[in-house]
């Protein structure tokens, strides 16, 4: 499996919708967590839209399933592959392009390297008598009915679950079957895998809480980005890390630029028009000096975020940050830094990304970054905390000011539901990213105006978010069964 076969202690959803059925494989084993830190090259993952949990994760699961069939010599015997989508995947998978992603993964495509155009309509465009070539070498018949949607069936490992089954001719039982959980941010694990954080290598600056992270900064006289760099260099080495960070930023920048220059209507049937390009045209006409505090700084920030999320909604190339639904915030605030902060440079962007990862890792390790598990507070709230703390850092903030900025940003989003209209990552997702980008900047500036002393710690707000997600009703967690999803008329 890929490095994305990793999990953390999830928030257990207790508020289920009526009629839901729990099935599965018993309790997952819980192992001790050595460190909260996830590599920047894992938490930031180049992929495709519109969803890290419903598109990127399922594609990785399907590719892993097909690879296993090939590696075990079963591939020549396979005559059919079926897939069952459970819980949130079953509820909103159609709008998120999950079946398309699964078929693309079975053919051997990877979200990191595929052409997004090769994924679109893989399933939805199937004609009668269609065939599928498993990992490019074994052809089988395929039909839309081979993918089933079971939103009322919830497996205990995670709300986002799917089971892939390979069948041989005339056999009444699967030749091979595996259940996967798409746990947010493109991370996937198999049923039976231990719920744990598994660092790729021993980390010299391991920490499991913001309290421990700040203590490391105090002890060694380092900034948060230095702690992150030490851990990441122990995994990848300095050259690979810097090359990876630069590639991540290049992908973020390319996504912003594409989104700023494309017009039209987003797919899916809601009739949502792209707005980032129009905002860019208006701002360029204003021709104001690009300085912080000028009226157009906030407008540019909104345009940057919307550009990313419009590209994501169209199934384009995006970077999970830490998810696709919240992918616009970290790039938008990074572009704000480069455009409006004197002296901003590439080295600053690397510090920005590393600080963001150190913050996001804490949330992933101690709560969740999955909207299906804890609502939009886990996605947009986490991304806002990452961007706010990271901006505070590159503006000269101390580690305690950085932690304060992250806490303010996350605190603001507590209780935010995930209620996508029509099961699409468009309404309210695109505008939420724009406003959360503004919130990230405001929280960073507010923290910089203090000395880092505050009542609520980032650890406390993470735990509060976890508890809130646990208590949140399932209909508000990426099922499109509540909130705006049922109150907005879809024609």
Language model: regions and residue ranges:
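N-terminal signal-anchor module of multipass membrane proteins
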Residues: 33-48, 64-65
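C-terminal regulatory domains involved in ligand/effector binding and gene-expression control
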Residues: 111-289
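Conserved phosphate/anionic-ligand binding catalytic regions in large, soluble enzymes, centered on
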Residues: 44-62, 314-333, 376-385
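Extended hydrophobic packing segments that form well-structured cores
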Residues: 455-491
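Glycine-rich nucleotide/cofactor/substrate-binding loop typically near the N-terminus or early
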Residues: 87-129
